[in-house]
Amino acid sequence: MTGTKTGTSAGTYEAVVVGGGTAGLSAALVLGRARRRTLVVDEGAPRNAPAAHMQGYLTRDGMPPAEFLAEGRREVEGYGVEIVRGRAVDVVRDGAGEFDVTLGSGDTVHARRLIVTTGLADELPSVPGVAERFGRDVLHCPYCHGWEVRDEAFGVLAATPMSVHQALMVGQWSNDVTLFLHTVAEDELADEDLRRLAAAGVAVVPGEVAELVVAGDRLTGVRLADGTTHDRSVLFVAPRPVPRTGLLERLGAELRETPFGSYPVVDPTGLTSVPGVWAAGNAAGFAEQVVNAASGGYRAAATLNGELLFADLDAAIVRGQG
């Protein structure tokens, strides 16, 4: 692919996987081992890039995400899968029910089937220091990072409908938890939520958060707009997820609205409402951690392989009858 000219047709593949994260590489591994001619289009922007380590994946607990993906690329290339660094900017379904995928380079590749694993982007609150510390001591997932920061002084920044749930959940890893309401008024919280927060021993602090306090390249506190500072060494925040559904929307895939964005309607294998198109990982749903994404990519690829097998057999039968 690296030698193709801009604007040219760069080949036909049995499957094109758009997205080179965990779900995409897992799908590509299955397809490569099934001897399917497969291309992975990898934009190189995995969701967990800010994190130094990933956790909760059996035998890979604590592995740096970049190292994990590099090993994944090495494995899939060993089965003849091609990987091109770039972005898929458009896709069109042709009259035969197959797909022409246009890359940012201007090249077009043809895919008999398509797996979309473009994931989502995390939109962080616009509080000074949050984006800069994200993945370090500003965290979003206690299952991913809670053990490493256990028993520290936790803060939770109210930013999404998940924030109260998050404040209750992180108490599993620390007895010192403060929920900063930020732009949420205390009377906006449900009575049941307030009772649960009190039962869990979570302190609730009203007032807008102005900035994070950092000293020696470590989070040391949370400063409110009124100037008061609360000592905290870890801040949990639930980013607003922004699904990358552009390609699926161009194909006319049916979407479902959730409190965390719009995602494609999929069956248990990841098949969307568009025949021949699967979605996996965070392209298919909000709460897909690395291990779930790998599983989703595997299921989509195995189903795609079987669907191609029977499509080719049925076509051979029709040709034989003619």
Region locations from a protein language model:
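N-terminal glycine-rich dinucleotide-binding loop that anchors FAD/FMN and/or NAD(P) in oxidoreductases
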Residues: 33, 37, 43-45, 52-79, ...
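Glycine-rich dinucleotide-binding loop and its adjacent helix/turn
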Residues: 123-168
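Beta1-alpha1 glycine-rich phosphate/pyrophosphate-binding loop at the start
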Residues: 13-67, 153, 162-187
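A conserved FAD-binding loop/helix module that cradles the flavin
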Residues: 27-29, 164-168, 280-322
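Residue-level detector of alpha-helix initiation sites
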Residues: 21-22, 122, 161-162, 284-285
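Extreme N-terminal leader/targeting segments of oxidoreductases
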Residues: 1-13, 70, 79
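FAD-site-proximal beta/loop scaffold in flavoenzymes
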Residues: 3, 132-148, 241-291, 299
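A Rossmann-like FAD-binding core segment of flavoenzymes
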Residues: 70-103, 109-111, 174-262, 309-322
